[in-house]
Amino acid sequence: MDLATFLVQCLNAVQYGLLLFLVASGLTLIFGIMGVINLAHGSFYMLGAYLAFALSPIFGDQFALRLVAGVVLAAAFGYVLEWAFFSFLYQRDHLQQVLLTYALILVFEELRSLAVGNDVHGVPVPPWLSGSFRLGGLMEYPWYRVFASVACLVVAFALYAVVNRTRLGMMIRAGASNRDMVRGLGVDIRRLYRIVFAGGVALAALAGMIAAPLSSVYPGMGSSVLIVCFVVVVIGGIGSITGALVASLLVGFVDTFGKVFFAEWSGVGVYLLMAVVLVWRPEGLMKRAV
Amino acid sequence: MRPTFTTLATALVATAFAAPAFAQSGPIKVGLMLPYSGTYASLGNAIENGFKLYVQEQGGKLGGREVQYFKVDDESEPSKATDNVNKLIKRDGVDVLVGTVHSGVALAMAKAARENNVLMVIPNAGADAITGALCSAGVVRSSFSNWQPGYAMGIVAGQKGVKRAMTVTWNYAAGTESVKGFAEGLEKGGGKVIKDLNLPFPGVEFQALLTEIAAQKPDAVYSFFAGGGAVKFVKDYAAAGLNKTIPLYGPGFLTDGTLEAQGASAQGMLTTLHYADDLNTPRNNAFRKAYAIAYKAQPDVYSVQGYDAAQILAAGLKAVDGDLSAGKRDALTTAMHKTVVDSPRGKFALSAAGNPIQDMYLREVKGNNNEFRSIAVKALADPARGCKL
Amino acid sequence: MRSDGIVTAPLNDTRAEVGELPDIGRREAGGWAVPTAAVLVLALLPLVLSPYAQDVVVRIAIYAVFALSLELLVGATGLVSLGHAAFLGIGAYAAVMGSGESGASLFFLVPIALAIAAAYALCVGLLSLRTRGVYFIMVTLAFAQMAYFVFHDTKVGGGSDGIFLYVKPVMQIAGTTVLDLANRAHFYYAVLVVLAATYAFIALLLGSRFGHALAGIRVNEQRMRAAGFSTTPYKLAAFVIAGALAGLAGLLLAVKDGGVNPELLSWHTSGEVLLMIILGGIGSLRGAVIGAIAFTLLKEACQSEALLGPLASHWQLTLGLVIIGFVAALPRGLIGLVERVRQVGAPRG
Amino acid sequence: MADASPTASTAATGTPLLSARGLGRRFGGLAAVDDVSIDLAVGQIHAVIGTNGAGKSTLVNMLSGELAPSAGSVHFAGHDVTRWPQPRRARAGLGRSYQRTTLFPEFSLAENCRLAAQAGAPRPWRFWERASADRAGLATALRVLAEAGLAADAERVAGTLSHGGKRQLEIAMCLATAPQALLLDEPLAGMGAEETGRMLALLTTLKATHAILLVEHDMDAVFKVADRVTVMVNGQVIASDVPERIRTDRAVQIAYLGDEAPTLAAGAAALLPEGAGPALGRPGGRPR
């Protein structure tokens, strides 16, 4: 392929990678800090998308407001869910966590189908982002995709700042590396967990809301994202935000160019990538040596 | 304690599924194996409604016998298909199978139907093999073969002077079969497919493929997607500005039941299908009226397929006065194959392999409707490759 | 792994004489009596059961083999795998592709299915055992997903529609057919034998030094290393054996369904088999079997309109809630319940 | 001073069985253990004492092979075992017990020991043989249980033992692997007086045939049985000598009590609650 095409493909890879990062970062935090494996995380992505769909008529063109409202709702939902459900999982072993969250997926999917049915729905792009610009001689690139990438980047940096600059972030990092130590520091661990979980849900939901206008909303949109996110977390290293970012981008590139060059085998690419990383660094790319 | 549990459980199984005795008199047992949960649930309901509508029009009787329904949710889950179909065949002892939407499931059903010598009418699943290599006298289809709409669109593209085309679809049978049909039709018109693009099902990350299309600059693109994929692909295609320079063609499923979600990005798209909602024939209008009254909802192509499934079955049963005994079997199946179905989509006959020989319509998206434009191919028959019938 | 605690087997009473020590391998009270009785009952069932009921029994029996193979991994070794369906599917594909258009002998198919499933298990094991806990779960899931895509996307296994098994395998000795799986009775008893053999094999395995080493690793791998066990080879061996047995179950499933489909490898299958063993009760072979029965019946119940009316079409909701309630209330599964009942009934010193 | 002079000990009792040179281990920025050299010889109990976080357990973990040292080397029975993984060292005769009791609670005492003994001759492929038929293993198990004074309880399920009993079983399991050297991490933690007595008696009998490293907080006990004492503070050795001279060593007293110290033994014992474990590198607690 010529250079221009190559560059555009890179752009696509980055854009996909960043979106993945938004979902995976929440997942990796929840893993890293609570040590809970949450299969239902994909459902939060779906929740976000459907929130965007449900809220768009209410807020109309107030896109920013819609996002904020969605994030707040999702965070609240996450906070409650942690209190009502996940807080009982910490003492359980991984096996039971897997089964309980697996059951949660079934429940969420059915609730979704009861609430909004099984049809596909589109979500409008805000007018001020609806245009697109010419990209070389090739094609037009919608402004909204640019926005999506930028938004993801902003969130990524914000997240990075929170984790590395604030007291909460300090506790999070400590929690990710050594849970006992945090307890030692006299931190209210339950509250920390609740906040982190709510944050994780909010992140996934935000990703869903940003993606909704691009992907539209449809049944089962969560679980396809989930497994790729697992791969991202494994590659990046549990609990590491930076790792999640790097891994997401890697996956983005492998997926994008896989589709172009080995159409038939493209589905396998990301998993091969994971295998390679496992051979090379079983703890993931960015796992701190503890 | 434990042994009693084990035996109790097995006993439970035993009693729960003891098969009822087969009956020649009494109602005809129709097994509806359709998706009632998950992504295809709405299709399943449409098909069931269509089927029942026709039976009601016949006074609730087929071949002079009452109809008794048995329902199983096939979950669109091929790996469970054999178990699910056996519930109908072996547990409920149905005389006729009606189903389903998902091709993989339908293939397993057809196999079971053949092995247990049960009649089967397929109201949607388009897998070519069902009326091809795996065809059998007792299995007929009221819908289409994946090949048909693709081929028709290929012909249309050829007429429009398309020389270099590309195809995009998911890595799954329905997609690849549809794409093959298109390529075949296009070559008739002197064009050819320069590249097939595909991605894992049910992935929806299309940007890479769109970029590839933009780079190759074909005269046209043919794509097969359904549900969420269809919506997203059409939107992304338009968002990438490709629809301005490179027309996007596809089978009707690309724009059926998805227009509300696709919105502006689908306007003016051309698709081929064996049905169009606004088909202005007395038969279609009557059907739509009756359906709307019966179910307070607008029918779609799936309701039509369900409706016609009942018609084909009725024709067969009529010929033998509802006598399903082995002796009358041949007469029954022959009648089903010979019947000319007066369908809302227009009259059609069945091929030897049991697939409709039907007109393929060219439709154009206007607003939220697929408007009938012209007949793309008249009385198109599936090649039924590999069928011995 | 945080597998400590869940998998505590019932404490054996100390009636044994010195030298005949309490044997954690034989974790089931009553030893072989109960399984043998169950097998006899199953062997007699065809006399009373309708053909459909027989099929259901066969189906459950095959799932039981599958569940037993996973129990060896999760219950006995403490390795929670969320990708076990891959081996089931690979075994099934191996069987179908091996028998081709004209069918093949079981003498050929069984080894093939076992070997290929084991081979993939070896590869996955080598990689995934470099990780532990949450990682291990995710990695096994991911590799199962990879196998899924290979069969679903590529021409390797007939794509998304899968492949049919045109001729069911037979077993011929000196020209005479001794076993023809196309015959319902033959197949029924073949499956029964496989189930019994698998159960016996795993029970034997757990009673052996190898099994005790696995138990030690499950309870406290650190201590085992300190004692001088190189634990990874043990875990790998368990992983491969479990994979091979799952492959055997896959072969039976392919024969039963007369074909294979990539959905067999989907992660929902992996989830369901995990459900089976925890429903029945982790850390007990019987639990795995009971779990297979219970799960199949539970799903039937959730889907039956007769029981739940309109809710039946939303059976996943019911199933999900039931699972949550169950895991929350009975972490040790039905076996645990049985034990509790027994202990209440006859408290032991 | 900071350099422990091994020659003193080697002179006393033949060549060292286990000798570490310049061991160091850093966690991130912090040096848990820094340039520690230590020797163990048969016939000698070498005690390591020190405040919490002095790096005692980290040291044991490096000697047993659970933790790879960032610097230094470990030699055991004439081999350089620095790169050997723990299981290999264990099979070579380097046994250890854990500060936090790590048994197989659901097994019988005998099975606990038999399993440990099995490591020597695993023969895992013979899956048709019941483990309970492992006569050799059982014999070893019963022998070591007797040595540890648990013979009567061979049938009992480990989980039901008293705390002291569990600590004894720990030692028994160590012995079952037929070790030449024993690394004991606070075997007395949380024991009653009379249990402690029994344990000390056991240790003194064992030392005739084993080289023993004893990490302990109970000063009275240490000074009762140790032939040599090494004192660690902040990951470094500040003194290593025979007990009498350690008692009176200024640096040690300052390290423990600040100035104006009476005699260390009583003071330190009072100051350091029994079973108070070092904060660093909890062995047995597996990272997640």
Model-found features: residue ranges?
Chain D
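Glycine-rich phosphate-binding loops of nucleotide-dependent enzymes
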Residues: 2-288
